[in-house]
Amino acid sequence: MGFSGWSPEAVEFFQDLQTDNTKAYWSAHKGFYEASVREPMAELLDELSGEFGPGRIARPYRDIRFRADKSPYKTEIYATLDRGGYVRFGADGLTAALGYYMMTAAQLERYRQAVIDDAHGAWLAELTERLRADGLQVGGGQMLKTAPRGYPGDHARIGLLRCKGLICWRQWPVAPWLHTAGAKDRVTGFLRTAAPLQQWLDQRVGPNPA
């Protein structure tokens, strides 16, 4: 059929799951989840795959082994794209993102060397400002409180140096277009606009081989 958005009932499903995160609720609504939540995500990923690579949908079950919150089910559905990209749908709307959420020690060292490079670092700083001017969010996930060891605390790009990851994202609240095929246009537009950040990271840092 092709992607046609998520229904208002899919939004309500996650709203109800937030208040009744139990096996009984999940079992009673699993068929709805598969048909009206997961299947639209799979259709969206299929339509994005030609430009952004295959996607993988995360399992709906939370890992609760070391968590105080023992709620068994995720109150959202999300997927990752092979060429960089993340799509999430939940009761609060739709989110698209890309970048490196958490870098390894080796990645961080390559990243920091690129940030202090006069050409590569300045280009990245200008890019992040352009993305923010376009209404996108850019941040480092977890941030160091001070400069990383061995790097000057007064560096012109200290904000970027303090990042332990670097991601760009946009979140849209629930609106009528979310229930239509137009939701794909929002995701596609974001991924194209933010693509230079993913390309910079892939070229200057490189993905985690693991």
Regions inferred by a protein language model and the residue ranges of each:
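Charge-dense, helix-prone N-terminal extensions
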Residues: 1-210
